[in-house]
Structures are given as C-alpha cells and as structure tokens.
Swiss-Prot record:
The gene is fabZ. Gene3D superfamilies: Hotdog Thioesterase (3.10.129.10). It comes from Xylella fastidiosa (strain M12). Its EC number is 4.2.1.59. This is 3-hydroxyacyl-[acyl-carrier-protein] dehydratase FabZ. The active site is at H63. The lineage of its organism: Bacteria, Pseudomonadati, Pseudomonadota, Gammaproteobacteria, Lysobacterales. Keywords: Cytoplasm, Lipid A biosynthesis, Lipid biosynthesis, Lipid metabolism, Lyase. It is an enzyme of class 4 (lyase). The keyword Lipid biosynthesis applies. GO terms for molecular function: (3R)-hydroxyacyl-[acyl-carrier-protein] dehydratase activity.
Amino acid sequence: MSDSPATAHTRLELPIDIIKIQALLPHRYPFLLVDRILELDQKQKRIVAQKNVSINEPFFQGHFPEHPVMPGVLIIEALAQAGGVMTQLDLSHNGHSSLLFYMVRVDNARFNKQVVPGDILILDMTMKRRIRNMGCYYGEARVNGEVVACADIMCAGVRS
C-alpha cells in the first residue's frame, strides 16, 4: 500500500474501483456517475474522480439523438457524487456511514464546453466547509485538462 499524501490518511489503495464506490454511494445504474477515484486527500478535503462517458448512456437517447451531449445537470450530479464518496469515507466507520446525502443547493454553475460520448470526465471536488450535517463543496469537471463545468454545491446528510 502506498504512503503517498493521497492515501496516507485513508489507508486506501488508489485508484478506488467501482465495487468500493458502490459500497459508499446508494446510486446504481443508470444514475451512478462515478467510475473510479483517482486521487483522495482527506487532509486537504479533496477528491478527483473519473466518469467515462459512453454513447451507451441512456440519456443520450433523447439528449440529443443526432448530436449527443451530456446534460449539464448530470455533470453537476457527477461532481456531487464524487463529493459524496469523499464525505462518506471521512464519516465512515468500517467503510459505511449512517448518513444519506442529498444535494440541496447549487450556486455559480457554469458550463463552458459540451461533454460528448468518448470523453473522460475528470471530477475535482474540494470541501470548503462542513457544518453539522451540511457539506459545502466547490467542483470542477474537466475533459482533456479543460474545465467544462464548475459549481458550488451544498449537500445535507440525513439518517438512513
């Protein structure tokens, strides 16, 4: 196991695969939008995740059949899910937290470029603060190093 800054606090081997992600998030197909965790630094409250965008995504059937584009709201949801993985790891005992997090607010959302089939979406989330059961994050989604979307996201945790 590596002792890099990304794993020293969590003692998790990176990358974190879909099996571990499914143990941390309640989302399932077709709404699980995080495929892999590439970086995790719980001391800095930062996570970097990956979403492989495939033409087989069900939303491409209607958005748009002749010009498939990933809906911006799903990019924001993917960012929130990445933040959810980080928060669950931070709060969990034996890999599971008793809180279920819901997105309750999105501010300053910007969409700079379309995300299309074949893109690898890199989701970079930083927790700005946590107040009791609320988490405030800033996230950027990138394709080929270029920011395609960003937003401030607030999530609230409730007992599951």
